[in-house]
């Protein structure tokens, strides 16, 4: 954290903490982090940056480090791509990242564990971007419960 004091503002529905590096938005009225971030951006009249990374490429540890670096660099939300063995809707860069992640042992369960560990270090909104197939294989109810 920077030497700047944490300045807290809000409208009674959320708490925005400005550390000088990133504005952390957490909900106080049941809104999720994603809704709260977009609400904050609308009120400020600003644009948001949604960064993307394929989870597990090249490792879970590297993914966590990159997520935290993207947050420090100003990302408002971060999409974590869940690698899939047949990523036909993705371009070649994401296809190759998915293949590397899978070759390194990335799994949906491992990625959900990564998200839980990241939650201990950051409150930035995280979105999982995936194909239906890995979720179906994991089990729809189990995936929803674990996510």
Question: Where are the regions that the model predicts?
Answer:
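N-terminal amphipathic alpha-helix/helix-capping segment at the start of soluble metabolic enzymes
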Residues: 2-4, 11, 27-50
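Conserved, mostly hydrophobic/aromatic
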Residues: 51, 81, 147
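Non-catalytic positions within long, well-ordered alpha-helices that form the structural scaffold/packing
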Residues: 68-71, 144
């Amino acid at each position: 954290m920077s030497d700047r004091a944490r300045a807290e503002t809000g409208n009674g529905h959320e708490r925005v903490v400005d550390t000088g590096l990133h504005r952390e938005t957490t909900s106080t009225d049941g809104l999720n982090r994603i809704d709260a971030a977009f609400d904050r951006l609308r009120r400020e009249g600003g644009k948001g940056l949604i960064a993307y990374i394929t989870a597990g490429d090249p490792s879970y540890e590297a993914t966590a480090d990159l997520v935290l670096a993207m947050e420090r660099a100003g990302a408002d939300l971060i999409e974590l791509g869940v690698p899939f063995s047949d990523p036909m809707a993705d371009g070649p860069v994401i296809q190759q990242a998915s293949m590397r992640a899978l070759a390194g042992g990335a799994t949906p369960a491992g990625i959900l564990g990564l998200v839980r560990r990241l939650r201990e270090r950051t409150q930035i909104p995280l979105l999982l971007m995936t194909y239906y197939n890995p979720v179906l294989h994991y089990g729809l109810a189990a995936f929803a419960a674990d996510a």
